């Protein structure tokens, strides 16, 4: 997809459009754009690493809760792993691949159970923060596909971002995020990027040039804002940007490619207060009932939308995770 140079085209986008290697992440510029008190104030940048999640785990082991708020970012991951062991595609194409350490201090004698409400809020807030950052970049169509993907584009939304959240079972969590920013996507691709979507905006749209530094700075600012609010407030914002409510989905108990007798179609009613997906089955033994689904147990495909693939398939920069009550190691 070619994009006409205009006032909305950044030098990073011009490099991508010309087929040149994307410029490396500008750390001083990111710092100048950051409006947080903690999140992102410490940034560890790597040109290439097997996995930012592994580096984050190592930092937590070495520093514990002192590492709270650190962002570990890589231009490329060579062995990224998403939910359920799926591949996390992360080539050096001008996207954002990073892990953020969330390590709040616990009261004396506290344990991981006390952190569950906060972790549920973090899981939901991450998707909202991606949506807010996408809107700030001029992509108003960005919405959340339960549990933690962000899709964007009209009339057929496609996968733009995904997250995964790992909890150590004690006092810390690592949030892994992938956002397609500068990579130019083909029209028939199952994923999209902020740059690709902006190419279709009308000429009169007044949006600033896109940059990875600005997207990450906005994400950190929004996540810090959301995590300082209540779970109810985060749920309300998540629901405001819900892509699936009122749509028909296919519920898969294995994968989209592997049919299972227990699979069924359902109407999405929304998410409950724990982040589970509320649906009304349209066929099968529970037809007509209202039930809740966990992203740890099922995957879903919106039947009216065909551009973004099954939840968790490596179509975009990252794989999603369960938005329900977190569990140790894989949420």
Can you describe what each PLM-predicted range is?
Residues 2-136, 203-206, 306-315, 320-331:
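N-terminal lobe of the biotin/lipoate ligase/transferase fold
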Residues 126-170, 177-178:
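Acidic (Asp/Glu) carboxylate-rich active-site/surface patches
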Residues 276-282:
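SH3/SH3-like beta-barrel fold
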Residues 285-302:
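A short macromolecule-binding patch
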Residues 199-264, 304-313, 326-330:
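Conserved, helical-rich catalytic subdomain that frames metal- and/or nucleotide-binding sites
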Residues 170-205:
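Short, acidic (Asp/Glu-rich) active-site segment that either coordinates a divalent metal cofactor
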């Amino acid at each position: 997809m070619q994009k006409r140079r205009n006032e909305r085209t950044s030098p990073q986008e011009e490099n991508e459009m010309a087929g040149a290697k994307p410029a490396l992440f500008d750390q001083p510029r990111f710092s100048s754009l950051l409006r947080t008190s903690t999140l992102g104030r410490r940034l560890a940048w790597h040109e290439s690493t097997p996995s930012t999640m592994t580096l984050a785990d190592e930092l937590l082991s070495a520093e514990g809760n002192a590492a709270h708020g650190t962002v570990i970012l890589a231009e490329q991951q060579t062995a990224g792993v998403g939910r359920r062991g799926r591949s996390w595609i992360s080539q050096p194409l001008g996207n954002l691949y990073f892990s953020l350490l969330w390590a709040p201090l616990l009261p004396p004698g506290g344990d991981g159970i006390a952190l569950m409400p906060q972790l549920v809020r973090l899981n939901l807030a991450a998707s909202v923060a991606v949506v807010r950052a996408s809107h700030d970049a001029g992509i108003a169509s960005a919405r959340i596909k339960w549990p933690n993907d962000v899709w964007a584009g009209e009339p057929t939304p496609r996968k733009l971002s995904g997250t995964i959240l790992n909890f150590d079972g004690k006092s810390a969590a690592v949030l892994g995020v992938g956002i397609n920013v500068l990579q130019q996507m083909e029209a028939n691709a199952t994923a999209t990027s902020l740059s690709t979507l902006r190419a279709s905006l009308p000429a009169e749209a007044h949006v600033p040039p896109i940059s990875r530094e600005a997207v990450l700075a906005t994400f950190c600012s929004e996540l810090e804002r959301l995590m300082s609010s209540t779970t109810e407030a985060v749920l309300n914002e998540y629901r405001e940007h819900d892509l699936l409510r009122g749509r028909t989905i296919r519920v898969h108990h294995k994968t989209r490619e592997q049919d299972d007798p227990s699979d069924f179609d359902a109407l999405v009613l929304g998410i409950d207060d724990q982040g589970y997906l509320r649906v009304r089955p349209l066929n099968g033994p529970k037809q007509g009932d209202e039930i809740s689904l966990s992203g740890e147990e099922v995957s879903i495909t919106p039947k009216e939308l065909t551009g973004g693939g099954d939840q968790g398939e490596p179509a975009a920069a990252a794989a999603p995770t369960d938005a329900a009550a977190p569990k140790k190691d894989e949420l």
